[in-house]
């Protein structure tokens, strides 16, 4: 389970004339999600729920109903605006906030000395074994 942390409030919500996809009544009894990021200037961005909003200069705080919406907005902030400091929190009805992305403080696309390597095979693709030579040996091609 991720560490429980206080949210960096003091920011404001982006300027948006529509809705955020409805926090649904379930959010009051289950959970909702929060994405927090810093912007150097006001910029227009696409909301994951449809429409466009203007992020404020400084800290932006936006509640959304689904985790996927927060991840979609995070990807947009990274690719379009080069904003890499966004954090996603799960907010429970009792007010408890849990950081869910990035869990260890480093986004998953970055290298981290403490992070375990998954799915790494130390060879070039041309050095892969011929699948016919591995067939019926009981081993997988990535284990050879």
Swiss-Prot record:
Top-rank taxon, per record: Bacteria
Coarse class of the protein's main subcellular location: membrane
Subcellular location: Cell inner membrane
GO biological process: photosynthesis
Pfam families: PsaD
Similarity annotation: Belongs to the PsaD family.
Oligomeric and partner information: The G.violaceus PSI reaction center is composed of one copy each of PsaA,B,C,D,E,F,L,M and Z, and forms trimeric complexes.
Physiological role: PsaD can form complexes with ferredoxin and ferredoxin-oxidoreductase in photosystem I (PS I) reaction center.
Protein name, as recorded: Photosystem I reaction center subunit II
Organism, scientific name: Gloeobacter violaceus (strain ATCC 29082 / PCC 7421)
Lineage, broadest ranks: Bacteria, Bacillati, Cyanobacteriota, Cyanophyceae, Gloeobacterales
Gene that this polypeptide is encoded by: psaD
